[in-house]
């Protein structure tokens, strides 16, 4: 299977629009949106009436059982992230957005009221019908975006079977989700624009792809809009 990854570096260059055009003109039946922070390729890609959605479990998060908590406050004093605070009634609770899952609270709690649970950090969707479309969405304030991108690609490849071509819409930037999306692709197409930031981010992507040993090509978009 040939795997075409479409990236941009700078946001707003027309990456997703270009990806949608490639999907249509190539007649691609295996498609993925790996922009897990803000997936939107599905808005311009129809023909997938059936959806199978599963939870994505990311890092651990602390929980405090209020029935066991004795209100000693040791967990709150030891938490360097300020994720534990009084919750009323002499009990303590965890702010899931602040918690880093280090597990220190579970070690210092004298009654075992604190525990670590796998956090549902997002959702993974596989749509089918006129082909296969995989995407995902990360919940606000969650990490593990690179891991979720890997899960999206794995779901696509498993469902695509013997398809000859897969087109993947990556995320902007050069961070973890972009690095994860580059793994194993045949070619990375960088959609850029003739602006200072567009050119600079394109150069960063080319260097990143070179380190990952991924071939690159460049599409200069919006040439008559941002001369």
At which residue positions do the language-model features occur?
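Conserved catalytic-core segment of NTP-binding enzymes
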Residues: 111, 118-123, 147, 151-227
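Walker A (P-loop) phosphate-binding motif
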Residues: 1-26
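Ferredoxin-like iron-sulfur electron-transfer modules
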Residues: 22-25, 48-71, 82-101, 130
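Residue-level preference for the first positions of well-ordered beta-strands
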Residues: 3-5, 28-30, 165-167
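Iron-sulfur cluster-binding cysteine motifs and their immediate structural context
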Residues: 74-94, 104-119
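Phosphate-binding/switch loop-helix module in NTP-utilizing enzymes
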Residues: 83-91, 95-100, 106, 138-177
